């Protein structure tokens, strides 16, 4: 596996820019090495804000048939989520100096955890369908899987893991700027009127940064998969949040 980097550095004195680039690339190379990937080149430019993007190449052992896909949900599968949700509202609150330090620290620690080990575990336990939860929120990415698989799912809102402080931020009326666009997906929720009053319901549409994996695992192996995720330390807050109903 190899990666090419696009680094965007803020305008500054040359010495300052060089130091930022060294630190940025050192961190990126370290994370890539942990994933068995080599940084082989890239491009650097100056802009108003710091930014870093990667173009990564890799291969799938066993070929494409071994890949976990978005469109492979099967009736009876259990839905597992490997990380809590709520980063959107937490960091929107942090920008307003409304989030408590421990909330942000806990979220950052989770965000810094690679999904690689968790992906291996769910694959070993028979997962055929899997995606990562990012900007479209849990509801948006689950809807992608449902549409691609022509399937229906049932979620248990009480089981969805939340970052500490996420509900507090919601109570303050703070949400991400991307939340309104994601909320439009509520039309896909069959019983919206019955569940929209649940405290954590808005977090289904909360955009995630470095979110966890949403995987469908055969029901008979779901509990063993959950235990493996938690005991390995790769996903200590993983949870079974629902099932594929048809």
Task: State each model region's role.
Residues 102-110, 128-129, 200-205:
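Short pre-catalytic strand/loop immediately N-terminal to key active-site residues, enriched for Gly-Thr
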Residues 74, 114-127, 198-199:
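Short, hydrophobic/aliphatic alpha-helical segments
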Residues 55-67, 102-122:
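Active-site glycine-rich loop that binds ribose-phosphate moieties when present
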Residues 16-38, 45-52, 124, 131-246:
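Glycine-/charge-enriched secondary-structure boundary and capping motifs
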Residues 46, 86, 106-114, 130-134, ...:
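Short, contiguous, pocket-lining structural segments
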Residues 3-5, 129, 153:
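Hydrophobic faces of well-ordered beta-strands that scaffold small-molecule active sites
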Residues 91-107, 232-235:
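Short, compositionally biased
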Residues 2-100, 242-243:
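Glycine-rich anion-binding loops of enzyme active sites
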């Amino acid at each position: 596996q190899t990666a090419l980097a696009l680094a965007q550095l803020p305008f500054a004195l040359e010495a300052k820019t060089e130091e930022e680039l060294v630190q940025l690339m050192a961190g990126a190379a370290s994370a890539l090495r942990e994933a068995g990937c080599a940084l082989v080149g890239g491009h650097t430019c100056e802009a108003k804000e710091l930014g870093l993007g990667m173009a990564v190449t890799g291969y799938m052992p066993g070929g494409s048939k071994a890949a976990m896909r978005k469109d492979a949900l099967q009736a009876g599968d259990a839905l597992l989520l490997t990380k809590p949700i709520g980063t959107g509202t937490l960091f929107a609150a942090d920008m307003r100096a409304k989030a408590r330090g421990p909330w942000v620290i806990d979220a950052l620690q989770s965000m810094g955890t690679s999904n690689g080990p968790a992906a291996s575990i769910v694959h070993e336990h028979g997962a055929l369908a899997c995606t990562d939860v990012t900007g479209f929120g849990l509801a948006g990415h689950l809807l992608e899987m449902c549409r691609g698989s022509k399937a229906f799912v049932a979620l248990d809102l009480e089981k969805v893991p939340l970052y500490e402080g996420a509900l507090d931020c919601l109570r303050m009326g703070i949400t991400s700027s991307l939340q309104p666009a994601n909320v439009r997906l509520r039309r896909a929720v069959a019983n919206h009127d019955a569940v929209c009053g649940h405290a954590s319901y808005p977090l289904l549409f909360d955009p995630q940064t470095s979110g966890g994996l949403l995987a469908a695992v055969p029901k008979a192996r779901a509990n063993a998969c959950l235990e493996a995720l938690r005991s390995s330390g790769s996903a200590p807050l993983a949870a079974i949040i629902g099932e594929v109903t048809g």
